[in-house]
């Protein structure tokens, strides 16, 4: 009898969580007073098209695979350890984009980020030509083998553990370059460096 009561109580406390898209009405359940949308560890698979977030957007540890077209984040984006693999052109993020441990393989042209971009521990393979980062750029422990020619980084560059062994002909790093043990065999003929190189 005691087992049956324990089984009934246990079944009543178990919640059935299934992955689903996030709609405009459910968003209200995850917004705080500052306009931050907090979805960390939530069972959502997608975000609505044209979503505008007044504050920060946190999709860490979610099954969301792509950001919606027309997304505007007036704060920062936190997508660490999520299934995020695609960021469409036209996405605007006023703050930083921290995507450590996500599934990003390429970064398209036309994505605007106002701060650092952290792509550490992602399967990143390519960055667009003329890529500009308004803060630091980290590609630590990625399979990325080359940086695009003409890349401009307003902060520091971190490449330790990546596949990068050569630098493009022209590049600008206004902060420091942290090699993290990588050996660079080809250096730019035109390098604008604001700081130092740390091996």
List the predicted regions and their residue ranges.
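Residues marking helix boundaries in flexible regions
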Residues: 5-10, 15, 94, 105, ...
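N-terminal capping/linker segments that flank leucine-rich repeat
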Residues: 2-57, 191-194, 199
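Canonical leucine-rich repeat
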Residues: 45-47, 65-67, 85-87, 107, ...
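Leucine-rich solenoid repeat scaffolds
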Residues: 158-199
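Mid-chain, structured segments of secreted extracytoplasmic proteins
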Residues: 57-103
């Amino acid at each position: 009898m005691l087992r049956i009561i324990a089984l009934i109580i246990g079944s009543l406390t178990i919640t059935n969580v299934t992955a689903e898209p996030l709609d405009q009405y459910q968003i209200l359940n995850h917004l705080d007073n500052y306009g931050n949308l907090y979805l960390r560890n939530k069972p959502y698979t997608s975000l609505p098209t044209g979503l505008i977030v007044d504050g920060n957007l946190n999709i860490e540890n979610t099954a969301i695979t792509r950001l919606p077209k027309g997304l505007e984040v007036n704060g920062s984006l936190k997508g660490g350890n999520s299934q995020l693999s695609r960021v469409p052109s036209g996405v605007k993020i006023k703050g930083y984009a921290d995507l450590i441990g996500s599934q990003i393989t390429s970064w398209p042209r036309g994505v605007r980020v106002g701060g650092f971009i952290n792509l550490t521990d992602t399967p990143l393979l390519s960055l667009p030509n003329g890529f500009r980062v308004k803060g630091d750029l980290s590609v630590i422990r990625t399979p990325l083998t080359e940086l695009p020619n003409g890349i401009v980084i307003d902060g520091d560059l971190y490449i330790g553990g990546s596949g990068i062994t050569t630098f493009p002909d022209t590049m600008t790093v206004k902060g420091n370059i942290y090699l993290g043990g990588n050996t660079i065999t080809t250096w730019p003929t035109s390098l604008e460096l604001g700081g130092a190189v740390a091996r």
